[in-house]
């Protein structure tokens, strides 16, 4: 009985430590995957990289990071669904971004300035690297 009473606190401690490790590590894996995909995409010489996209970073100052990621996902979806280029990479990036994004957002193209897909991906890569350095 004495050994069991000593093991219970140790097991609880291990369980708590493991859960903290797993939750922190999930953030790292998703961000690592996003950054890896962004590195691959931005190094490509592809005509799709010059396609016009809404400048999702020109949003109001009160926009949250999650809303910005949501808008970026909308633009990525628009590109890979309508232009049939870089689908594998843009689709994967969209899926990973959706795990970091809010569920609903809007991109009002009439009021939004435009940029290129390359610029969007480069800015997104910078943001993700900063986020990863804090994770």
UniProtKB/Swiss-Prot annotation:
Disulfide bonds join 48-85, 70-105. SUPFAM superfamilies: 4-helical cytokines. GO terms for biological process: B cell activation; immune response; interleukin-4-mediated signaling pathway; negative regulation of inflammatory response; positive regulation of DNA-templated transcription; positive regulation of macroautophagy; regulation of immune response. GO terms for cellular component: extracellular space. One of its GO terms (molecular function) is cytokine activity. Its main location: secreted. InterPro entries: 4_helix_cytokine-like_core, IL-4, IL-4/IL-13, IL-4/IL-13_CS. Residues 1-24 form the signal peptide. Participates in at least several B-cell activation processes as well as of other cell types. It is a costimulator of DNA-synthesis. It induces the expression of class II MHC molecules on resting B-cells. It enhances both secretion and cell surface expression of IgE and IgG1. It also regulates the expression of the low affinity Fc receptor for IgE (CD23) on both lymphocytes and monocytes. Positively regulates IL31RA expression in macrophages. Stimulates autophagy in dendritic cells by interfering with mTORC1 signaling and through the induction of RUFY4. PANTHER family: INTERLEUKIN-4. This is Interleukin-4. It comes from Ovis aries (Sheep).
């Amino acid at each position: 009985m004495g050994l069991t009473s000593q093991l219970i606190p140790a097991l609880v401690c291990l369980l708590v430590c493991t859960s903290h490790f797993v939750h922190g590590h999930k953030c790292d894996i998703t961000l690592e995957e996003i950054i890896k995909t962004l590195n691959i995409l931005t190094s490509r010489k592809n005509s799709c990289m010059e396609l016009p996209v809404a400048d999702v970073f020109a949003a109001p100052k009160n926009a949250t990071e999650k809303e910005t990621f949501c808008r970026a996902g909308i633009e990525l979806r628009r590109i890979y669904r309508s232009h049939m280029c870089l689908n594998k990479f843009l689709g994967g990036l969209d899926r990973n971004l959706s795990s970091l994004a809010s569920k609903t957002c809007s991109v009002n193209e009439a009021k939004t300035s435009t940029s290129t897909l390359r610029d969007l991906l480069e800015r997104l890569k910078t943001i993700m690297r900063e986020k990863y350095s804090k994770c």
